[in-house]
Every structure is written in C-alpha cells, then in structure tokens.
C-alpha cells in the first residue's frame, strides 16, 4: 500500500449479524479528529453486496410468479442453485468501485430508459466472468418468449429503478479525503475442513477483487462465534418481521435475516483464522491472484459480544 494519510479502502467483514452495519454507523458518528486517529477519511461512500443478494431474491419471486421458475436460488433449500454466484457478487462490487472512482453521479440516460435491462445485464456479465454460468437472463427470454419476458421485466421494474438510483446517489463528485467502505460476509458449511473449497470463504472471493482494490485495502474483521451469529440473526429476523426499522431502500437495514439453513450451510464457519495462519506477515491476509500474492493490510481484530458497541483499534499505516 502506498504511504498516505488515509486508507483508500476499508473492508468490513464478518459472519452475518456480527455488527458490520452497526460499526459502519459508528464510524459515521466520529469526528474528523477521531477518524484521523484511525487513518480514515470520511466514510459515507460504501460498496456492499447485500443489496444485490436482496435483489436476487426479489427477482426470483417475480420470476416464479410470472415464469414459473427462479433464476438464482433453489426454492426448497433457499440457497444458490450454483454457489459460484458468490463470485458474481464480487464482480458486481468490483464494478461499483470503479464507477465510484469516476466520480460522476449522473445516471446515463440509457440506464434510466430501461433499469431492468441494466441490472439483468450486470448480473449476466458478472456471472459469466466466473466461468461457471451462461447468460441466464438472455436464456430466459429465449425460453419464455418476448411477451412473457416483458411481463417479468415489468414486475421487476420498480426494484431495479431503486437500485439504479441508489447506486448513483452513492457516487461522490470527489474522493478527496474519503475512505471507501466495503461490506461483505463470506463463509462455508458448518464443520467444513480447510482450505474451504471454492467458491466458499474469503480466500476465493478476495482473489476475485481487482488488483487495485487489493493493493489499497485494509480489512476490519469483527470476530464472533457462529453460535453468536446464529442467535443475533434470529433476533434481527424476528424484529424485521415485526416491522421494526424497516425501509423501502434496497440498502442494508439492521433487520434483514438470513434463512437458518443458509446460516448453517454457507456461514457455519469461515477461513479468516486459516488464512492468517498461512501468512508470512503476522496480522495480514495472504491472497493469491494471477500469480501474485497480496497481503491485505492490517487485520484489526474487534472481538465483541453481540449487542455491544465495537471498539476500533488504531492501526499503523504501512
């Protein structure tokens, strides 16, 4: 990482319901003097894959209603048909990062004219990059015909329009004095051995990030046990069903719950400890990409109990 006053990128990662969003809110509450001590700039600009996961589920609901089938998730297990969609999500937020770097918050007119096509195309392009998928929406159109596909798109229009609007609202006119915050969670099946098999875990997903991101990122990992994560997830899902703190926004609310079988099958463990044990540099995550090894600077462990405010530790810029 180049010597500089502020971290260009801070990644928040942990198991679900571990306090990433609460910690992000805490960062936003800090004064400039306080954030300077952590080598952070202003942190309101974010990159988060949760809105895309949420949109996948809503698109699937529309597809099942209109077309009689789903695109991303198995209706019975509620898990991905193909777990390589974890890679799809990384490629989506790679694109978001570079759109942010352009510092142009004006939405291109062609996207405004058809926000559904814009989002469906983004999913297809990102998925194809993993090497594991065809162009799914293109194939849906061929399978069901123009009229039925048009009805499906109409069902998805409002959702896609909101995602488009919020994506560009998140793009600043300048990155001067800012730290871009990434938020995402990765894991693997309960009881899995290490290394986790692709596409599970941080080892797989981090290696898909663009080199520029890996070269400029530090990671703040919030450490909780899977059991703590399960319990907090159940609590916030219940609060969500009761209508507490809900929002029409596609952005992350504190009350989105992950299905319990998904918690067990995809977040029953993670590979952060395993990766740290492989690193020749203590406290760094070693990530291999395209024949190079990147060491993500510096793990700041926030070991916390669910419900308590996380305390950030000061780290050294290198």
List the predicted regions and their residue ranges.
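Glycine-rich phosphate-binding loop of ATP-dependent small-molecule kinases
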Residues: 1-318
């Amino acid at each position: 990482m180049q010597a500089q006053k502020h971290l260009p990128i801070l990644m928040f990662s942990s198991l679900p319901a571990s306090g990433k969003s609460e910690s992000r809110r805490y960062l936003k509450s800090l004064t400039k003097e306080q954030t300077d001590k952590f080598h952070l700039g202003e942190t309101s600009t974010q990159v988060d894959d949760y809105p895309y996961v949420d949109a996948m589920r809503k698109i699937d609901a529309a597809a099942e209603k209109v077309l009689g089938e789903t695109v991303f998730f198995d209706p019975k297990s509620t898990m991905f048909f193909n777990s390589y969609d974890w890679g799809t999500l990384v490629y989506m937020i790679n694109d978001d990062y570079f759109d942010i770097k352009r510092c142009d918050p004006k939405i291109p007119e062609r996207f405004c004219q058809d926000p559904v096509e814009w989002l469906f195309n983004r999913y297809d392009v990102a998925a194809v990059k993993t090497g594991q998928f065809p162009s799914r929406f293109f194939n849906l159109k061929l399978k069901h015909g123009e009229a039925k596909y048009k009805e499906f798109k109409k069902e998805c229009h409002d959702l896609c329009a909101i995602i488009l609007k919020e994506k560009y609202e998140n793009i600043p006119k300048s990155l001067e004095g800012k730290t871009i915050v990434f938020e995402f969670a990765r894991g693997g099946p309960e009881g899995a051995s290490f290394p986790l098999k692709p596409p599970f875990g941080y080892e797989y997903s981090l290696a898909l990030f663009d080199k520029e991101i890996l070269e400029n990122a530090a990671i703040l990992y919030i450490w909780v046990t899977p059991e703590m994560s399960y319990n907090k997830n159940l609590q916030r899902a219940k609060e969500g069903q009761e209508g507490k703190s809900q929002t029409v926004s596609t952005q992350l609310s504190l009350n989105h719950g992950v299905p319990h079988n998904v918690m067990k099958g995809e977040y029953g463990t993670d590979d952060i400890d395993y990766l740290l044990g492989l690193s020749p540099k203590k406290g760094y995550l070693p990530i291999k990409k395209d024949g190079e090894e990147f060491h993500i600077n510096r793990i700041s462990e926030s070991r916390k109990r669910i419900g308590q405010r996380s305390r950030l530790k000061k780290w050294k810029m290198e």
